[in-house]
Every structure is written in C-alpha cells, then in structure tokens.
Swiss-Prot record:
GO terms for biological process: DNA replication, synthesis of primer. The keyword Metal-binding applies. It catalyses: ssDNA + n NTP = ssDNA/pppN(pN)n-1 hybrid + (n-1) diphosphate. It comes from Borreliella burgdorferi (strain ATCC 35210 / DSM 4680 / CIP 102532 / B31). InterPro entries: DNA_primase_core_N_sf, DNA_primase_DnaG, DNA_primase_Znf_CHC2, DnaG_bac, DNAG_N, DnaG_primase, TOPRIM_DnaG_bac, TOPRIM_dom. Belongs to the DnaG primase family. The gene is dnaG. HAMAP family: DNA_primase_DnaG. Pfam families: DNAG_N, Toprim_2, Zn_ribbon_DnaG. This is DNA primase.
Amino acid sequence: MKYLQTVASMKSKFDIVAIVEQYIKLVKSGSAYKGLCPFHAEKTPSFFVNPLQGYFYCFGCKKGGDVIGFLMDMEKINYNDALKILCEKSGIHYDDLKISRGSENKNENKDMVSKIYSLNSRLINTIKFFLSKNKKALDYVLKSRAISKEIVDLFELGYLPFNFKNGLELHDFLVSKGYSSEVLRKSGLFSKTNPKVSILFQRLIFPIKDFKGNVVGFGGRDLDGKGSKYINLGETEVFKKRELLYGFYEGFEEIKSTKSVILVEGYIDVLAFFTSGIKRAVSTLGTAFSKEHLALIQRYADEIIFSFDGDDAGLSATLKAYQICLPFNINVSVVRMDFGTDPADVLKSEGVDSLQKILNNRCDAFEYLLDVYSNKYNLNKTVDLNAMINLFLNLINLSKVDTQKKIFLDKLSNKLGIGVTTLLKDYYRIKERFVVDNNKRNLYAHNDDSYERYLIVALLKNFSYFSIVRRNIIDSDLINVDARKVFMCFENLFENNKDFSLMDLKKNLKDTYKVSEFFLKKF
C-alpha cells in the first residue's frame, strides 16, 4: 500500500503536460491540451492531455493512460523503467520503492530484454572485426557499392564467418560466455529448426538500432548467391519490424532539422545517401511500408521523399506507400530513377554529388505516378484508359482535403483530355462503392472465396513469389485471421530460408499458428 501511495503521490505532483511536450507539440484547448497523436498517423489533432486529472487520451486510436503509461508507450520500455525516469525527475530514490509481487513478470521480461541487448552489443565488435578481415565482403561494400569507410563505421557493418572463434561456432562461443539457451533462442540469431546454426553466417551484416541507439536486431546480405539475397531476424522481445526504420537513429538529427525523410528500398540505398552527405534516408526492414512507419516519421518530419528502385517492383512500392500517406496530408515527392537502377548504382556511376542532383529534381508524387502510368498504359485502348481512370480516382478518394482532391482531378483531366465534370461522375460512383465496401469488410473476412485465400494458394504453388509479395503486403493488411497467420508463417519460412513440404506446413500451421481446420481444408 505504501508503494502505491508513493507512486500515486509522485504522479500527482508531476506535470504530465511537461512530459508529453518533450515529444510532441501541444496547444491549450479549454482546460486541457491537444496535439497530433504520437501513436498513429493523423492530420487533425485528436490527442488530449488533461493536466488536472493527470491522464492522456487519443480519440483516434483510443490509446490512453497516465504519465507512466505514456512514457512506457513512447520509449518502448516497461513499467519499472518508466518509473525510474519519473523518480529521477521527482527527486525520489527509485531503490526506496518496494516493488510489489505483481511486477515480477515485468522484471523477468526486462531481464530478458537486457540480456538480448547485451548479446547484440557483444556481437557488434566481433562482426566488425571479422568484416575488417574479409576482403570479399569489404570489396563488395567499399568498391562494388562505393560506400565510404566512414559510413561503414557509422552503421557498424560486420561479417560473420562459419568458424567463429577458436574452432567454436557462434552458439557454443556465446554459451561459453554465459548466455543461456533460452536467451540465444529468443535473440532471433539462430534457426528455429537448427538452434545451433545462426541465420547470419557468411553474410554481410547490418546492425539495426532503435531510436535510442540500442542494437535490437540484424539484417544480412548473401554474397555468394547461395541463399535468399537479404534476410532479417524474426520478431523478438526487442525487434519489432513495424516500429523500426533502418537509418532512423543515425539520421535522427538531420531528420529533425530538415523535417524531411527519404524513404528508400534497402539498407545499401540508405548507406549510399549517407555516403553522399544526405543523412536522412531510411528503409523498412524487408517489409512493406506501413501506417506504423508513417506514424514514426510524422512525429519529426512533414515531408517524405520516395526513392525506390527504377523497376516495376519499385513503382509498385511507390504506389502502395503513397496510398498509405495520402489520407494524412503529408507532403510526398518522388525521386525519378532510371529503370533497373537504385541509389547505390547512381552513387557508383556518377559520384557523390549525383544523389543530391536527382534529389533536387524530385517531383510531386501524384504527378510522378500520373506520368509513369500514362506511359505504362495504352490510353488509346478503352480497357487501359478505364483502368487508369479507376486507379487515379481511387487514389484521389484517399485524400481527406477537398482542395487537394480538386487539384488532383484537374491534373488527371489535363493528362487524359477528359473533362472534370465527366471524371466527377465516375469519382462519386467510386466514392459510393468505397462506402459500401467498407460496410461489407467484415462480411468479406469470412468469405471462403475471398482473394486472400487465393493469394495463399498461389504462394503455396510457387513460394518464390513471396519475395515479391512481402514487399507490398504485410500480415496486418489481410482481413481473414487465418490468412494472416499463414502469412506470418510464410514470413518465418522466408526469413530462415527453409524448405518445406505441404504436409509439414499444414501441421505447423495447425499446431504452432493455430490456423483453423476449416481454413486448412481449403488447400
């Protein structure tokens, strides 16, 4: 009881507004304060802080709580760590607080997180050493991709040989240093089917950091052409792909000062921009750009510049990412890349100033897509013309700003030579259909013949397509719960480069992922 009273007293005398304002801008609104929610992307403030009652609440994402809960969510820390921060600011000695038994599970989780951080930190210096001794890996980064040594050091790139140290493999070496089998299993470094084999062996390694600089995971690139080109660790206690962007920590100061982020396709592209002196490039971790990524960016920037590869996959990624951004009225532009090239190619062939030049010539995302798709479609064919009209009217419908919609309609009208009045008729038809589709969304989730089941069947027939699909879809995009679980299983198989039979897969889906028998019978 004394512990609870102490915590309550501490919270009551601490200004929650002062804490929240360290993360977002607040403005007075009656007796409360409001601002843009830091936990989801939005363009109109729905996040409120009540200083009298000491709580926050967002009417958009429904997240709320007290000052400790806010710190836990913002810093991705547990209850006790948030409490420590408040103790420091309140002049209370944390050690004097008697933590109740109810916090034991939290402490266990904190202990595991601490051990994973320790393990990852220990690994950093070792993989950096092995990279310095591996000519092939060094030549790939420094010569083939023209990344500067300064940037290699900044991002702490590494390499992991098969024979780790003194004839020991990595697993046995770490055990000899006191790490338990449970910690090694939960670190994500090792194969689930062969727990002593690291999924990163003989790969160029990219340490991935959270916004506080903790190494939370790793990505790896194959240099021999023997496995998946890129892999990332699976999800762990500290490694949440939807909450992370590669390069965000290293580029944080420039992102804050310019209020701008360059979104690229992969790790090497991030390094290419940094080598050019442009230190605000980020990439997702092998998954599609999501609303969670956008929410992270919008805390610190009001502009996103897409710089994806100049191929069909890059165009598809640009379109999907733009569809996510449009409802939130963030300024989006696109860097034009020649077909088949990426930022690292431009850096190597044209020098360190080349990326700044193409960045200066970026164009509005809507205009870029309009130009590209008008060349991609044969507008003399009715079917192609209708497809383009539908594509762009659906895009326009995503915008929440009426003036922006009018500008987009004018641009589409000028490009196609079709009057705005005519386009508006189709637009309102699409808008009505969109409302109907939304109302039926839950019904479709239980429709056995939904497109999601067909997607799963197609991937089962040719799993190699998954490397393309995963760049444009993440599991949360799927409506059907069972389809989502299957997709998560596929992600795990892909990350571990594992072969499988249909019989083994079905057993795994049933026993591990709890996919329903009814769904499994469909394939």
